[in-house]
């Protein structure tokens, strides 16, 4: 049978049959997979036996290393306005990894009730044509347009701890996962998600994952960083040299610098790019 891995705990795999959506828990990897040092990850499409082993892992259309997930249709990137405070650097760190894998992005902005100026903080991202939804979890309201965007797709949830991911999932899927209040001393939420898993209800599927501290962009090469952002891909074709890193090159030789000068790329996005490039050079992830 063909299925998809929805959860992994202590070397056991829970798999959903793609045909009838029945859950088959506690499967193991076959001896051949172990011999080849190959292990399934959440999101993998696999061939499996009803009461036994996973026999085959199908080719992945995309994959993240930390957390280990595969075959994502789109990413739901959560960012809060306050508690924790909005940070374009943190948001761009998430987008750097997601867009490097060519995964479509939806930005979900939470805690909008804590700052009346919330829309202005996202102006640069609106200008870059990101798909943005403003969410108030306290009102338990999910925009109809957002539901339509998520239907029949595998949606990967990512964001700093404490931004309201679990509250959103509870509201959206009408499930009750553990929620903890923001830690005032650390200005961040306590981790409420401990395993990567696919949560499913009707035509909606969401990959919930551990919070910010386990999310890494160290898997990205220097070459990937230079054109990871979607808007950089758009203008980098105008660079004179294919190896352009949009840093030391002259403006007339760099499509990114010209777009920056013309106001087509926000200055803050370019500054964040230089920060990530510098972090890579220092090997300080």
UniProtKB/Swiss-Prot annotation:
HAMAP family: GTPase_RsgA (MF_01820). This is Small ribosomal subunit biogenesis GTPase RsgA. It comes from Mesomycoplasma hyopneumoniae (strain 232) (Mycoplasma hyopneumoniae). GO terms for cellular component: cytoplasm. The keyword Metal-binding applies. Its EC number is 3.6.1.-. It is found in: Cytoplasm. Its cofactor is Zn(2+). GTP binds at residues 110-113, 159-167.
């Amino acid at each position: 049978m063909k299925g998809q891995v929805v959860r992994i705990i202590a070397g056991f795999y829970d798999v959903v049959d793609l045909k009838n959506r029945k859950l088959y828990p506690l499967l193991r990897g076959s001896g051949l997979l172990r011999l080849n040092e190959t292990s399934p990850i959440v999101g993998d499409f696999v061939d499996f036996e009803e009461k036994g082993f996973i026999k085959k892992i199908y080719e992945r259309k995309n994959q993240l290393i930390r957390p280990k997930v595969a075959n994502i249709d789109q990413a739901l990137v959560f960012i809060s306005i306050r508690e924790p405070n909005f940070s374009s650097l943190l948001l761009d760190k998430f987008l750097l990894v997601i867009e490097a894998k060519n995964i479509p992005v939806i930005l979900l902005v939470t805690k909008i009730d804590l700052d009346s100026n919330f829309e202005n903080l996202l102006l640069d991202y609106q200008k870059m044509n990101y798909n943005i939804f403003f969410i108030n979890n306290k009102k338990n309201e999910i925009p109809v347009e957002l539901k339509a965007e998520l239907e029949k797709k595998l949606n990967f949830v990512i964001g700093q701890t404490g931004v309201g991911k679990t509250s959103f999932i509870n509201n959206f899927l009408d499930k009750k996962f553990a929620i903890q209040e923001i830690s005032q001393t650390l200005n961040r939420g306590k981790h409420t998600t401990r395993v990567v898993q696919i949560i499913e209800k009707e035509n909606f599927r969401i990959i919930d994952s551990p919070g910010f501290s386990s999310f890494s962009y160290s898997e990205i090469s220097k070459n990937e960083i230079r054109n990871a952002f979607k808007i950089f891909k758009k203008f980098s074709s105008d660079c004179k040299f294919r190896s352009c890193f949009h840093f030391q090159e002259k403006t007339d030789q760099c499509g990114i610098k010209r777009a920056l000068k013309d106001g087509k790329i926000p200055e803050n996005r370019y500054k964040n790019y230089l920060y990530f490039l510098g972090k890579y050079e220092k090997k300080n992830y």
